[in-house]
């Protein structure tokens, strides 16, 4: 089993580095501009994720589309969701500990206590709309090794229960026909198909 771990924002890209500067408050940007930047940043990795899935990798992504939605909704902003994949399985680390607000001079953007509570509630609302067999809530206070084993066990179960990859479901309910994806010219746009009575895909690769 091969897997790749990604996280957003990624400081190794120009867009990701700019996002970190905004979060650290060294660069000013409106909320709408920032969320558009986050959306652009996720889209930048579309081809990489598609290629990895084509090559039978499991792709584990920290802070992907659900995070984008939860944070944008906290600012009352609707974001573009095309060119993102719908997670096949989601792990949500939840804590019942009171949020501790950092001193203002070292706070990053979004780290105010009130804002964090709104974002947390947004996550709960989003998770309520995710099918129960496609997500797992993990208490964040558990030992890291226990969390790792939970993630590994659940991931292997999903992996073992699925068969060969043909389509990757995208967030807007379109499908990427990964079977026809050519890794040489990689013109993935022509592989996007509408959901016209297409059966739910089965795959042995998934975004967590």
Curated annotation (Swiss-Prot):
Pfam families: Thymidylate_kin
PANTHER family: THYMIDYLATE KINASE
One MF term in the entry's GO annotations: dTMP kinase activity
Transmembrane segments: none
Function recorded in the entry: Catalyzes the conversion of dTMP to dTDP.
One GO term of the biological process aspect: dTDP biosynthetic process
PROSITE patterns: THYMIDYLATE_KINASE
Gene source species: African swine fever virus (isolate Tick/Malawi/Lil 20-1/1983) (ASFV)
Designated name of the protein: Truncated thymidylate kinase
InterPro entries linked to this entry: P-loop_NTPase, Thymidylate_kin-like_dom
Gene3D superfamilies assigned to the protein according to its UniProt record, in alphabetical order: P-loop containing nucleotide triphosphate hydrolases
Family: Belongs to the thymidylate kinase family.
Domain of life: Viruses
